[in-house]
């Protein structure tokens, strides 16, 4: 799907081990055997590993934030081997606290030297102080995700559009970069940034 869309990079970030049905730590250790560059075979059109290919695969993790200390569910010895790592709050791994507590947990998570992305900081079930979050992210040289799936009316996250709008306005205030994510749980959602792009254009 990524090659068909002409994408140059595809990030794969499996959820951390505490997720229901989540992978064991060994899953992440096994990333070392996965080729990172792909293209289509000329004769068959099959997608194959190819050193000079046009698509680079990045193997990462979406680690679960487990406490207000920013504790993650994947040890640093695994995190340091990832191509990239993001951290996110999920209800199965983190008990919602006050706005201050949720913000503290998020900030401490991306202060981890191996985490440079905070995933979907837009769920109304876990309210955040965006002003503090953005200032701390800027200082830590971390980026905040604009999650396309959070804008889907069927998303379990609450207040996605309103919260992402507030987040983006705060990022604009502090000149803080963001990263768009599709949160693709199926191949047909790869590269689908339509809702996020539309919202960002509206705020230009």
Give, region by region, the residue ranges found by the protein language model:
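Ser/Thr-glycine-rich phosphate-binding loops at phosphate-binding pockets of nucleotides
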Residues: 1, 9-14
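Residue-level detector of anion-binding/catalytic polar loops
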Residues: 8-9, 56, 143, 177
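Short acidic/histidine-rich active-site segments
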Residues: 15, 176-190
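Extended substrate/RNA-proximal surfaces in nucleic-acid metabolism proteins
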Residues: 16-146, 201-203
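Short gly/pro/ser/thr-enriched loop/turn and capping motifs at secondary-structure boundaries
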Residues: 18, 93-94, 151-153, 186-188
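Histidine/acidic-residue-rich catalytic or RNA/ligand-binding cores of hydrolases
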Residues: 21-25, 127-135, 154-170, 187-200
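His/Asp/Glu-enriched short active-site or ligand-binding loop at hydrolase and phosphoryl-transfer sites
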Residues: 143-156
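C-terminal active-site rim and adjoining tail of enzyme catalytic domains
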Residues: 149, 168, 177, 181
């Amino acid at each position: 799907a990524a090659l068909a869309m002409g994408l140059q990079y595809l990030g794969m970030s499996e959820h951390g081990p505490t997720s229901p049905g989540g992978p064991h730590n060994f899953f992440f250790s096994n990333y070392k055997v996965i080729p990172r560059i792909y293209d289509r075979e000329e004769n068959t059109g099959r997608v194959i590993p190819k050193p000079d290919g046009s698509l680079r695969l990045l193997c990462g993790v979406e680690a679960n934030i487990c406490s207000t200390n920013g504790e993650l569910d994947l040890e640093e010895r695994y995190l340091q081997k990832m191509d990239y790592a993001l951290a996110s709050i999920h209800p199965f791994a983190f008990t919602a606290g006050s706005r201050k507590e949720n913000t503290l947990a998020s900030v401490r998570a991306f202060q981890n030297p191996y985490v440079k992305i905070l995933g979907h900081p837009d769920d109304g079930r876990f309210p955040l102080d965006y002003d503090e979050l953005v200032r701390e992210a800027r200082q830590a040289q971390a980026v905040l995700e604009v999650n396309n799936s959070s804008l889907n009316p069927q998303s379990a996250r609450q207040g996605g559009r309103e919260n992402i709008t507030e987040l983006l306005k705060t990022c604009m205030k502090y000149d803080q970069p963001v990263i768009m994510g599709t949160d693709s749980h199926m191949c047909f959602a790869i590269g689908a940034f339509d809702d996020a792009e539309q919202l960002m254009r509206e705020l230009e």
